[in-house]
Amino acid sequence: MAAKDVKFGDSARKKMLVGVNVLADAVKATLGPKGRNVVLAKSFGAPTITKDGVSVAKEIELKDAFENMGAQLVKEVASKANDAAGDGTTTATVLAQAIVNEGLKAVAAGMNPMDLKRGIDKATAAVVAELKNLSKPCADSKAIAQVGTISANSDDSIGNIIAEAMEKVGKEGVITVEEGSGLENELSVVEGMQFDRGYLSPYFVNKPDTMVAELEGPLLLLVDKKISNIRELLPVLEAVAKAGRPLLIVAEDVEGEALATLVVNNMRGIVKVAAVKAPGFGDRRKAMLQDIAVLTGGQVISEEIGLSLETATLEHLGNAKRVILSKENTTIIDGAGADTEIEARVKQIRAQIEETSSDYDREKLQERLAKLAGGVAVIKVGAGTEVEMKEKKARVEDALHATRAAVEEGVVPGGGVALVRALAAIVDLKGENEDQNVGIALLRRAVEAPLRQITANAGDEPSVVADKVKQGSGNFGYNAATGEYGDMIEMGILDPAKVTRSALQAAASIGGLMITTEAMIADAPSEAPAGGGMPDMGGMGGMGGMM
């Protein structure tokens, strides 16, 4: 096992503090409407320019192992805030830096670190409760657009497109962000349920100009196995032909003789039919087939529940107003499923979202939920260059998380004002002893840090602005973008309450851990032996020694 380097007490904390400050100083430059840019060198390709705090934090690794530990712990603050609310990472970093710097001063002055931590925790709980009281519900799309704009570093085109997307697909709908091909941002909304499987044969196409197959008022046959034998399908095909309606077959696969017969029947006009593979794989495929069944009021023909293709009747088939199949996608519009059953299915998926611990599973479940409950909106981000595209896409994703958080827990005045107003909750708060009181006072100073940093980045005097904001009340604050004072909500400067709360909780949690650190252990740097000369390369036919 490699030798370890161990540091204790003050010398350990000093090293850690250096790392904390290096990372936080780089990240906090991006805070606020006048946040500065940070340039990141890449091992290949052009450097990236960003105003996104997380991107900056991710790039930082320090040479000294102990300093690096401090930097990585602050990175943890940012990712904790990001996991909880999807935004607020820079605010969380600024708060953590303030708490750690003040806290370590107090520890160096002889305070008890455990009591300091208890004081910080007590004050944090009071501020979080006060933030809940300050928050106002975020109902209309104007407020949603304002939240999106602030989070996207004051880019109102991003705020507006997110508000429009939310209006179209509802609060439950899925909004995905993709790289577009033009210079402008575009929004496209998919109504109904869309899944990423296209027609199995181009001979099903009935609109050659757009290369799509459209079925009006079709019946849907949902099967969870491969269909290769046409004899299994005959009873259903005959019943559908008698009913005189088109048919969409969604199965694990349709191949060989079965597919050929369907194509021939379709081309001769005997039965208007199209076939498509079921979406997903394994258990997820079964679940998605069941979703389609619930949406269209049909049943999945599965041997697991004792149904086979030969015994299937029209009652087992789903109904929809229209189905559109392209080469890549299938869209089912206006399924005829019962509302009560769809609601029950939505409830079931929501319960699974709550239980799952995997981010991938959660994302897939949310997609399924949106397809049943709302719709899917796709924001295509437009930009002039690859570098700008990446940076803009990261900002759109941040803004999207922020607006979701705003809808969930409401909004508070932005620009660091909400934290200053929440100070009212800890003005008279007292701990059980003097050291806890120092912890409470320490947090009282730390919560001003975001407001001071936003002001400093805008080139103004932090102390003057902080004092003036503290003298005001309610939503009165400082608009760093214009240099004016006024009502933050009226000026459209809002933060989601959830983002502010998560940032403070993450910062207090990691800050408390750092203050109570007593020892640090890292791999000892390996002593590389001094490089000697090359050995004599004798023995190579007459080449004595190579000089």
UniProtKB/Swiss-Prot annotation:
Keywords tagged on the record: ATP-binding, Chaperone, Cytoplasm, Isomerase, Nucleotide-binding
Catalytic reaction equation(s): ATP + H2O + a folded polypeptide = ADP + phosphate + an unfolded polypeptide
UniProt-listed Pfam families: Cpn60_TCP1
Transmembrane segments: none
A GO cellular-component term linked to this record: cytoplasm
Entry-linked InterPro entries: Chaperonin_Cpn60_CS, Cpn60/GroEL, Cpn60/GroEL/TCP-1, GroEL-like_apical_dom_sf, GROEL-like_equatorial_sf, TCP-1-like_intermed_sf
Isomerase among keywords: yes
Annotated Gene3D superfamilies: GroEL (3.50.7.10), GroEL-like equatorial domain (1.10.560.10), TCP-1-like chaperonin intermediate domain (3.30.260.10)
Annotated protein name in UniProt: Chaperonin GroEL
Source organism (scientific name): Pseudomonas putida (strain GB-1)
Gene: groEL
